[in-house]
């Protein structure tokens, strides 16, 4: 086979969080999406609130203990885990507001609809369920020799916007986010199957000029077949490699909803 080039768009799916203070910290990512509540429903709404929290309760899944941490420490830890410190200060501030909003909404949800497994906490440090949040020790491990400068930069950004959260009709929003779009954001209905009034497509043309907006990977025919063999053992490979991957349905925002690989529909 001759060489063949495929372009893939990666859609992030979940938040990632460190499991404990002693665990190896995860790699901070540039993308993350829906909070845990939306894994089961996008219609649940927390009760209203009078004031923002001063402290959150976090369940350590390793020790089983519920630990209290200040909102400031939580938001700093969340930004450390969710966004590289090399990003511009305004981006770090935006991430801080999103992280704070997520935590505030989750706190209110637990007040009105407690999750038994959380033992009274607002969330846990389970990386598969809740927003990422480094402890200071984990941030030190992750940033290494760059810790002091990185931590100071993130802390300064957090302090500037700590009083703020994003609300819709007086309730903290579902603060879903990703690193970038393909020039237009996607609707919640397309992603989750349920409408969210404020999560609708909007133009985001600046994304198309962002670093790492487009990445390519090259494979030979044999390499591509081997890569998808386990997932699609019954795939049929046409002699014309241009027919191996066919894009089917797309959303109005341009998100690929269905693709055919080796004659097999994937969605």
For each of these PLM feature ranges, what is it?
Residues 1-267:
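Conserved, single-site charged/polar hotspot
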């Amino acid at each position: 086979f001759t060489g063949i080039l495929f372009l893939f768009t990666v859609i992030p799916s979940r938040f990632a969080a460190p499991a404990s203070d002693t665990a190896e910290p995860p790699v901070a990512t540039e993308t993350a999406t829906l909070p845990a509540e939306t894994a089961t429903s996008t219609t649940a709404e927390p009760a209203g609130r009078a004031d923002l929290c001063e402290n959150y309760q976090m369940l350590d899944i390793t020790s089983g203990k519920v630990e209290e941490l200040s909102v400031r420490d939580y938001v700093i830890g969340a930004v450390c885990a969710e966004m590289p410190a090399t990003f511009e200060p305004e981006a770090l501030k935006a991430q801080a507001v999103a992280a704070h909003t997520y935590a505030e909404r989750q706190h209110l949800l637990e007040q009105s609809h407690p999750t038994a497994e959380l033992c009274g906490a607002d969330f846990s440090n389970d990386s598969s369920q809740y927003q990422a949040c480094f402890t200071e020790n984990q941030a030190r491990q992750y940033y290494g020799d760059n810790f002091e400068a990185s931590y100071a930069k993130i802390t300064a950004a957090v302090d500037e916007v700590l009083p703020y959260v994003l609300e819709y009709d007086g309730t903290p929003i579902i603060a879903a986010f990703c690193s970038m779009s393909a020039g237009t954001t996607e609707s919640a209905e397309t992603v989750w199957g349920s409408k969210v009034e404020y999560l609708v497509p909007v133009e985001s043309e600046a994304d198309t000029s962002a670093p790492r907006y487009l990445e390519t990977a090259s494979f030979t025919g044999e390499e591509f077949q081997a890569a998808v063999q386990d997932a699609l053992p019954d795939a049929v490979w046409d002699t014309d490699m241009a027919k191996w991957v066919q894009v089917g349905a797309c959303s109005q925002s341009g998100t690929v909803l269905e693709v055919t690989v080796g004659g097999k529909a994937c969605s």
